[in-house]
Amino acid sequence: MGQKVTGGIKTVDMRDPTYRPLKQELQGLDYCKPTRLDLLLDMPPVSYDVQLLHSWNNNDRSLNVFVKEDDKLIFHRHPVAQSTDAIRGKVGYTRGLHVWQITWAMRQRGTHAVVGVATADAPLHSVGYTTLVGNNHESWGWDLGRNRLYHDGKNQPSKTYPAFLEPDETFIVPDSFLVALDMDDGTLSFIVDGQYMGVAFRGLKGKKLYPVVSAVWGHCEIRMRYLNGLDPEPLPLMDLCRRSVRLALGKERLGAIPALPLPASLKAYLLYQ
C-alpha cells in the first residue's frame, strides 16, 4: 500500500479522516473514484492481444531503451551515464476513458522516475539526469520519487501530488499502480493500491496523448499493461445496474453469484461472461 513517510512510515487510507489534508484549501478535494472509472475498474481486463496493441512503441523511443522481444509489454534501459530516456505507447488517445497499469520496481527508479502522458512532439531524450516528462508544454508527468507534478517545467512551478501531503511528508509509490486518462473530461489521475489519488492534471481535452515514462536507472525494466477503456457515450443502464449488484455483494462474495436464484443469462451477465 502507498505510504507516507515523516519521522516514520504511516499507511495512507484516504477513507480514514485522520489522513485528510490539514490544509483548509485541500479539504474539499474529492478522493472518491468517478463513476465511469469505478465501472471500468470493475470490468475484466482486455485480452493480451489488445494489451499488445496499446503497449510500448519500439519505434518511438530514445535510442537508449528497447522493447523486450520476449515480453513486449516491458522496455529495458541501457546503463548509459548522464542520460534521461523516454518511450511512448503505441496509441494516442483523443476520446474516452483509458486505464493502464505501470509496474516499475522501486529499487530501479533512481533520481528521476517520471510517469505520465505526452503529445507526439514531446522529446524522448535529454543529456544529464532530469525530469524529462513534464519539462515542456508537450508532456505531463508525476515524479514518483519527489511526489511532484510537472508540466512545462522550465516555465511553471511543480505541484505536490498526492495533494494531501504535508511539506515534511513523502509518499512511497509501490512497484505497481494505475494511470487513468479521461480525454472526455481532460484529466489525468493515478490510483495506488485501489485508492484514487485525485486529479493530477486538467485541461487535456482536445489533445492526442500517449502514455509515456522517462527513466535514468541503468537496466531498469518498466511494464505497461493496458487494462481497458470506455467510450464517451452515456453509460448503459444495464451496466450501471450490474455494477450496483456487484457492489452490494462485495468482492468477497462475487464467487457466490452462480448459486444465486437467478436466470443463467443474468448470472452470466453479472460475471461479465
Curated annotation (Swiss-Prot):
Domain SOCS box intervals: 232-273
InterPro entries in alphabetical order: B30.2/SPRY, B30.2/SPRY_sf, ConA-like_dom_sf, FBXO45-Fsn/SPSB_families, SOCS_box, SPRY_dom
CDD domains: SPRY_SOCS1-2-4
This protein's pathway: Protein modification; protein ubiquitination
Family assignment from sequence similarity: Belongs to the SPSB family.
CC annotations in GO: cytosol
Oligomer and partners: Component of the probable ECS(SPSB1) E3 ubiquitin-protein ligase complex which contains CUL5, RNF7/RBX2, Elongin BC complex and SPSB1. Interacts with CUL5, RNF7, ELOB and ELOC. Directly interacts with MET tyrosine kinase domain in the presence and in the absence of HGF, however HGF treatment has a positive effect on this interaction. When phosphorylated, interacts with RASA1 without affecting its stability. Interacts (via B30.2/SPRY domain) with PAWR; this interaction is direct and occurs in association with the Elongin BC complex. Interacts with EPHB2. Interacts with NOS2.
GO BP terms: protein ubiquitination; ubiquitin-dependent protein catabolic process
Record keywords: Cytoplasm, Phosphoprotein, Ubl conjugation pathway
UniProt superkingdom: Eukaryota
Entry domain remark: The SOCS box domain mediates the interaction with the Elongin BC complex, an adapter module in different E3 ubiquitin ligase complexes. Essential for its ability to link NOS2 and the ECS E3 ubiquitin ligase complex components ELOC and CUL5.
Keyword Phosphoprotein applies: yes
GO molecular function, one term: ubiquitin-like ligase-substrate adaptor activity
Gene3D superfamilies assigned: 2.60.120.920, SOCS box
Name listed for the protein in its UniProt record: SPRY domain-containing SOCS box protein 1
Keyword Phosphoprotein: yes
Lineage, highest ranks first: Eukaryota, Metazoa, Chordata, Craniata, Vertebrata
Record-linked PANTHER family: SPRY DOMAIN CONTAINING SOCS BOX PROTEIN, SPRY DOMAIN-CONTAINING SOCS BOX PROTEIN 1
Residue span(s) of domain B30.2/SPRY: 33-231
Gene from which this protein is expressed: Spsb1
Compartments, record wording: Cytoplasm; Cytoplasm, Cytosol
Function noted in UniProt: Substrate recognition component of a SCF-like ECS (Elongin BC-CUL2/5-SOCS-box protein) E3 ubiquitin-protein ligase complex which mediates the ubiquitination and subsequent proteasomal degradation of target proteins. Negatively regulates nitric oxide (NO) production and limits cellular toxicity in activated macrophages by mediating the ubiquitination and proteasomal degradation of NOS2. Acts as a bridge which links the NOS2 with the ECS E3 ubiquitin ligase complex components ELOC and CUL5.
Organism: Mus musculus (Mouse)
